[in-house]
């Protein structure tokens, strides 16, 4: 019996050693893989959970709430800062706006807006309400705002510059054509160079003092045969008798002047003198005098009559009825579509030039006013941890699922390394 027992013991001891050897080699990699998988899975869950802080005996348990719920506001600020500093920078928004706001797209947008407005106001009731609103606005503008603006303009130095520009651009480019010269010469002949006006002007001119002066000048300056006439006969007597003739016999004098004007061809001479006449043909001093008189006259007229005229105009016109008639014609006219195309085309060019010059300053003002950073912070802070977890898992589902398996592989490798250390580097027994 002792022999049998002795023979069995070595066999049992060898089997036990074999089992220990298998566990010695197999267990560390399995345990390492299990630890890696479990720890990574737990770490991922602890990013979001628990959603709220937990307490034990009145004390907050560490690592509660999870990483994202605890630092949600800090996370929101970082995301908002990255969005405004890296993604939606002023230069990037400027490039996006330039790419989107092309002249063609601006024209299409304006055309769509105009057509939409035209369709909206095809309803008579809406059109009537708009007409009343426009009428009230126009009446207020012409009755109150425009008179004040005209009065302020007439008192400022800007009005002088405006009137000077008007004179340079309008009056400076005027030129009297032949037909205009003919009509102007006829008007001057009928209203200025009339026989009666010439007779009265000559009577007023030939005063006794004027006749004496002319007689004296003729005696002193005449030469040759004219000296003999001036000093022997003299011109004082003939001028005095001619004046008496004009005073005493006005009808005969007027007939005489009529024949004189006809024989002198005054109309033809005036037409020739006025044809082609323009401000540019005048001397610089004359042009400056005309400009000064033009500016002074318009400024005085604007100051004296402008506010009152605008106010009377605003009170005398039924602006609501006028606006209703205009809107009815615009909406019902077949030419409106053509006008819309031209308006959209012209407005798009104007808007494109404005945006080319002012887009960058507008973007710099627009971004702070938009408050993107604060809006992102508010949205993220108002998002519940459950929704945030679901959103991140939806975006990185495969990556989050792969992390525990990566941890398992790393744990398995660490277990193999432990086996290597125990069996080779630091053997046991």
From Swiss-Prot:
Membrane topology per record: Multi-pass membrane protein
Lineage top rank: taxon: Bacteria
State the similarity comment: Belongs to the UPF0754 family.
> Which residues span the membrane?
18-38, 406-426
Official protein name in the record: UPF0754 membrane protein glr0504
Asked if the record carries the keyword DNA damage, the reply is no
Q: Which organism is it from?
A: Gloeobacter violaceus (strain ATCC 29082 / PCC 7421)
Keywords from the UniProt entry: Cell inner membrane, Cell membrane, Membrane, Transmembrane, Transmembrane helix
List the InterPro entries hit by this protein, alphabetically.
DUF445, UCP032178
Gene Ontology cellular component terms for the protein in this record = plasma membrane
Q: Which PANTHER family match?
A: UPF0754 MEMBRANE PROTEIN YHEB
UniProt entry tagged with the keyword Membrane: yes
Q: Where is the signal peptide?
A: none
Location of the protein in the cell: Cell inner membrane
């Amino acid at each position: 019996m002792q022999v049998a027992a002795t023979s069995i013991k070595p066999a049992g001891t060898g089997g036990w050693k074999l089992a220990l050897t298998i566990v010695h080699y197999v267990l560390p990699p399995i345990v390492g893989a299990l630890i890696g998988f479990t720890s990574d899975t737990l770490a991922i869950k602890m990013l979001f959970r628990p959603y709220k802080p937990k307490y034990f005996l009145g004390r907050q348990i560490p690592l509660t709430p999870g990483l994202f719920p605890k630092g949600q506001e800090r996370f929101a600020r970082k995301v908002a800062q990255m969005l405004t500093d890296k993604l939606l920078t002023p230069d990037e928004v400027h490039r996006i706006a330039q790419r989107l706001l092309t002249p063609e797209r601006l024209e299409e947008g304006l055309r769509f807006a105009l057509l939409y407005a035209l369709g909206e106001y095809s309803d008579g009731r809406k059109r009537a309400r708009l007409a009343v609103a426009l009428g009230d606005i126009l009446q207020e503008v012409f009755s109150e705002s425009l008179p004040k603006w005209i009065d302020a303009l007439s008192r400022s130095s800007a009005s002088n510059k405006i009137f000077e520009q008007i004179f340079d651009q309008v009056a400076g480019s005027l030129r009297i054509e032949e037909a205009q010269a003919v009509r102007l010469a006829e008007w001057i002949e009928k209203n200025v160079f009339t026989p009666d006006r010439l007779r009265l002007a000559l009577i007023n001119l030939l005063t006794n003092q004027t006749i004496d002066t002319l007689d004296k000048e003729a005696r002193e300056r005449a030469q040759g045969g004219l000296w003999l006439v001036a000093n022997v006969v003299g011109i004082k007597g003939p001028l005095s008798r001619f004046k008496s003739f004009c005073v005493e016999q006005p009808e005969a004098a007027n007939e005489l002047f009529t024949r004189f004007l006809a024989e002198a061809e005054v109309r033809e001479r005036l037409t020739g003198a006025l044809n082609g006449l323009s401000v540019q043909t005048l001397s610089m001093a004359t042009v400056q005098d005309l400009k000064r008189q033009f500016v002074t006259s318009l400024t005085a007229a604007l100051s004296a009559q402008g506010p009152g005229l605008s106010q009377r105009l605003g009170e005398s016109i039924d602006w609501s009825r006028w606006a209703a008639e205009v809107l009815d014609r615009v909406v019902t006219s077949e030419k409106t579509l053509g006008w819309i195309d031209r308006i959209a085309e012209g407005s798009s060019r104007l808007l494109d030039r404005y945006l080319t010059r002012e887009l960058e300053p507008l973007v710099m003002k627009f971004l702070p006013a938009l408050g993107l950073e604060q809006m992102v912070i508010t949205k993220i802070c108002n998002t519940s941890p459950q929704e945030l977890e679901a959103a991140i898992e939806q975006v990185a589902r495969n990556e989050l699922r792969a992390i525990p398996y990566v941890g398992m592989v790393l744990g398995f490798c660490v277990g193999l390394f432990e086996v290597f250390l125990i069996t080779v580097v630091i053997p046991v027994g």
